Amino acid sequence: MNDVITDVNPDSGLSILEGILTAAGFKDDPDCWERINISRGDERLFSFRIRPLDEQEVADLRRQCTRFLPNPNGAGYPRIEGEVNLVRLRSMKIYAATVPDDRALIWDSAEAQQRLGVMRGEDMIDCVLMAGEKDAVIERIDALSGYGARVFDTLKN
């Protein structure tokens, strides 16, 4: 076996520690972001940038969109998960993954919210994006967040 873990990654020249710290900064790294363009017909209406979400963010969003029910075994037991509001979950996922500067400019625009009659950024997403557009954005967020990514090489003997 010739593969030995060293203190330096030969591909990047980074030390192991530098590599770990670089990997940990994925949410704030513009190289990990992607621009989403919203167009109708031939006209580009607006664009915004999305970033990867970490697993805790995804779990928190799911919890916020889940209705919890009393445990049938009694009040002394933890509540159980009921129905997940998938429409709200998808909107909140887009909202959370939008880069903060773009979120403030687009989804949290007080004037746009007032004119569309909504109170929150997640509601703006429901008003502005069509179902298929939301689906496409969610796919990109999941891809940026590493879902479906191949993160290791398989060793063959």
Task: Say what each PLM segment does.
Residues 31-43:
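Short acidic-hydrophobic surface loop/beta-edge motif
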Residues 1-30, 151-157:
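Low-complexity intrinsically disordered segments
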Residues 2-7, 40-157:
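Short, surface-exposed, charged amphipathic helix/loop patches that serve as local interaction elements
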Residues 17, 21, 36-38, 112:
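Extended hydrophobic/Leu-rich segments
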